[in-house]
Curated annotation (Swiss-Prot):
InterPro entries: HATPase_C_sf, HSP90_C, Hsp90_fam, Hsp90_N, Ribosomal_Su5_D2-typ_SF. The keyword RNA-binding does not apply. A motif (Prevents secretion from ER) lies at residues 765-768. Pfam families: HATPase_c_3, HSP90. Residues 733-743 have a biased composition (Polar residues). Belongs to the heat shock protein 90 family. Keywords: ATP-binding, Calcium, Chaperone, Endoplasmic reticulum, Glycoprotein, Golgi apparatus, Nucleotide-binding, Phosphoprotein, Signal. GO terms for cellular component: endoplasmic reticulum; Golgi apparatus; Golgi-associated vesicle; perinuclear region of cytoplasm. GO terms for molecular function: ATP binding; ATP hydrolysis activity; ATP-dependent protein folding chaperone; unfolded protein binding. Induction: Expression is greatly reduced following starvation. Phosphorylated. It comes from Dictyostelium discoideum (Social amoeba). This is Endoplasmin homolog.
Length: 768
């Protein structure tokens, strides 16, 4: 919000603030002698130069630009190189119709040179571009928000060449005052003499004819007098890194004047003197020529080395923008190497897409699906992403929250647009239809195209491996992106009772005749759900069951409703599951429910604080009972996930919704429990203990946690003793627990208890 307010403030000021140029005796304080001018030449510029004073309002606007508009000081270099690139593009375009404009020899080389003068704290940036006349210096540099590039684009708006021009606002130049307290701009146009423009950003600027004459031939040199707190930008390694970060794909070569220490060959060394025997330590001295002389002694031998500092122009952007080439001209090895340079790994991408879009907006892009997910894939607060945005080959940002959905943060690649408008600082993207087009037409469409191609390959290994690593992200996409939910859902994979991995479409193809539901179960792992009693009847009847074992699956399925608008998703962990039954099976179920009605009522009454109801199960085949949730309740897997999230958030949510118990009337244990209830009635202690044990074990097998493990253990102990001896011959004490029913505490006669367990008499009760 602050950034938006800032932009509107600046744009508002642009709307009504104009620079008025009034002659003034005030002169910008600039040390011209540190730029190579003699004292006399500097004095001549001061005396003969035309001096202008910024109006008060414009001076305030300058302060806003310098202190508020840009968030990073390093941006200045990107802006100045971009301006230099614009100037080179202009002269190249003009030379298409008049080749003489380029000149001859070195002057015809279109390039950018950067030179560091540490002695004077000056950074020079020189281009052989179109240059500026005196009037253009006043108009382009003396007037804020008056961009020469913008005006030039108007002149050549009918030509495609203009799309290479970077500048869109006239404030990028002033970013130099982030690191410099004053600046000297020397410029030579083919249409005028060479002029010098100087300013300290505080009050005024001066324009004068250069007393040195035409030293540039053509082009512009910007000399920044670096502030004391910004001297890191006089370090050649820092400059190299910034050029590589922001401008390595500029169309024109960028050279830096670098220094390095080299060893002087022995045959070129002069005045070599052997060291004496008493010199046993290494010594280093500097020669008058700036050479270093290193001498050592080893086993009485004399070894002498000399080094010297040499200077040379080093090209910093020899990497060409791969995405600007036609896909047919790029080798697989080049794609792989480019991916590695972007991802900073030695991995090989799973697949990639190199494309160009045309129409209302034009984009060039290379998108990669990486071999491995980034470590911060689900860290929504992490800065940056694997995708980098360029505008006319200039790096803008990798913070692309406006363009890249959270679930696609793993993508690696570049997007370059000639049409994308930026705000005045080029750091924040304006919300508009072009951004929306990039998001929908470039990123989403191409990603879906890539996974479609992978999934349709006869060898499913590559797609299956991709999905194991990035499937959770795709599921998140199906949840968040309603517009593309159906398209993404087609490519989701799940393990099942019949396949290692299957799509929903594959499941539907294998459906039984008359089946109109997709049966699934959620859980912690494939092994755990394969062993769940909830799938017994489905498997027995020949139905395939999907195993949804990714935590995000719990949130995905409710968003899907139906697959292909036809097949409903049915969670076997919820009540109301239905299988196709004939009339005979339905009648048998009704008869069974009537037969077991006493037990159903008894269990509901005894466990009323825990159960919503007790019903005859349709999902069990081999197990005696199970707990399920109702249609709106919390399943066992949901409870597990929610508890884990609550633990991370240091909170304790309540999971007190009542469950539904389903019993299997064909299981011997359930039959015996019904018989005992009918024989001994509801007050029988063994029946009560059995009911509680049945509930707790049903909860465990369903995946729910036990509220009170101690009480559960007491029930187990008591049941063991009931089966081992009669209640009358066993010394224990029964206590009531108002929440969990009866529990058992043993007496103090341990010896008698041990004897009873060693030689138990015949029980008079039915063993459960």
């Amino acid at each position: 919000m602050k950034s938006i307010t800032k932009i509107f403030l600046i744009l508002g000021l642009f709307a009504f603030l104009l620079v008025a140029f009034a002659p003034s005796s005030s002169v910008a304080t600039v040390n011209l002698e540190s730029d190579g001018y003699t004292e006399a030449e500097a004095k001549l510029i001061e005396e003969k130069g035309e001096k202008f004073t910024f109006q008060t309002e414009v001076n305030k606007l300058m302060n806003i630009i310098i202190n508020s508009l840009y968030s990073k000081k390093e941006i200045f270099l990107r802006e100045l190189i971009s301006n230099a690139s614009d100037a080179l593009d202009k002269i190249r375009f003009l030379a298409l119709t008049n080749a003489d404009l380029l000149g001859e020899g070195e002057q015809s080389n279109l390039d950018i040179h950067i030179k560091i003068d540490k002695a004077n704290n000056v950074l020079h940036i020189t281009d052989r571009g179109v240059g500026m006349t005196k009037d253009e210096l006043v108009r382009n540099l003396g007037t804020i928000a008056q961009s020469g590039t913008k005006e030039f684009i108007k002149k050549v708006s009918d030509s495609a060449e203009s799309s290479n021009l970077i500048g869109q606002f006239g404030v990028g130049f002033y970013s130099l005052f982030l690191v410099a307290d004053s600046v000297v701009v020397t410029s030579k146009s083919n249409d005028d003499d060479q002029y010098v423009w100087t300013s300290d950003s505080q009050s005024s600027y001066t324009i004068a004819k250069d007393p040195k004459g035409n030293t540039l031939g053509r082009g512009t040199r910007i000399s920044l007098h670096i502030k004391d707190d910004s001297k890191e930008f006089l370090d050649q390694e820092v400059i190299k890194q910034l050029v590589k970060k922001y401008s390595q794909f500029i169309n024109f070569p960028i050279y830096l004047y670098v220094s390095e220490e080299v060893e002087i060959p022995k045959e070129e060394q002069e005045d070599s003197k052997p060291i004496t025997d008493d010199q046993v330590e290494e010594t280093t001295t500097t020669t008058e020529e700036g050479e270093e002389e290193t001498t050592t002694e080893e086993e009485g031998q004399t070894e002498e080395k000399k080094t010297k500092t040499v200077y040379k122009w080093e090209e910093l952007n020899d990497s060409k923008p791969l995405w600007m080439k036609a896909a047919k001209d790029v080798t697989k090895e080049e794609y792989t190497e480019f991916f590695r340079s972007l991802s900073k790994t030695q991995d090989t991408p799973i697949t990639y897409s190199h494309f160009k879009t045309e129409g209302d907006t034009e984009f060039r892009s290379i998108l990669y699906i990486p071999e491995n997910p980034p470590s911060n894939m689900f860290d929504l607060e992490a800065a940056g992403s694997g995708l980098k945005l360029f505008v006319r080959r200039v790096f803008i940002t990798d913070n692309l929250k406006e363009l890249v959905p959270n679930w696609l943060r793993f993508l690696v690649g570049v997007i370059d647009s000639d049409d994308l408008p930026l705000n005045v600082s080029r750091e924040m993207l304006q919300q508009n239809k072009i951004l929306d087009a990039i998001k929908k037409k470039v990123i989403l469409v191409k990603f879906i195209s890539m996974i479609k191609e992978l999934s349709e390959d006869e060898d499913k290994t590559k797609y299956n491996e991709f999905f194991k690593k990035f499937g959770s992200s795709m599921k998140l996409g199906a949840i968040e992106d309603q517009a593309n939910k159906k398209r993404l859902t087609k490519y989701l994979l799940f393990p099942s009772s019949k396949e290692e991995l299957t799509t929903f479409a594959g499941y539907v193809e294998r459906m039984k005749e008359g089946q109109d539901q997709i049966y699934f179960i959620t859980g912690k792992s494939k092994d755990s759900v394969e062993a769940s009693p909830l799938i017994e009847q489905a498997i027995k009847k020949g139905y395939e069951v999907l195993f949804l074992v990714d935590p995000i699956d719990e949130y995905l399925v409710p968003q899907l409703d139906k697959f292909d608008d036809k097949y409903k998703f049915t969670n076997l962990a919820r009540s109301g599951v239905k299988f196709n039954e004939d009339k005979e099976e339905e009648d048998q179920r009704k008869q069974t429910a009537e037969e077991f009605k006493p037990l159903l009522s008894y269990l509901k009454k005894t466990l009323s604080d825990k159960l919503e109801k007790v019903v005859i199960s349709k999902v069990l085949a081999d197990s005696p009972s199970i707990l399920v949730s109702n249609s709106w309740g919390v399943t066992a897997n949901q409870e597990r996930i929610m508890k884990a999230q609550a633990h991370q958030a240091n909170a304790q949510p309540q999971f007190n919704s009542k469950k539904i118990m389903e019993i299997n009337p064909s299981h011997p244990l359930i039959k015996k429990l019904l018989n005992r209830l009918n024989e001994f009635g509801e007050e029988d202690e063994t029946t009560k203990v059995s009911a509680h044990v049945l509930y707790e074990t049903s909860a465990l097998t369903a995946g729910y946690s036990i509220d009170n493990p101690t009480n559960f253990a007491d029930f187990i102990y008591k049941l063991m003793m009931i089966n081992g001896d009669s209640l009358a011959q066993t010394n224990f004490e029964t206590t009531k627990n108002e929440n969990s029913g009866p529990s058992v505490s043993f007496g103090d006669d341990d010896e008698n208890q041990q004897q009873d367990f060693q030689q138990p008499p015949q029980s008079t009760h039915d063993e459960l």
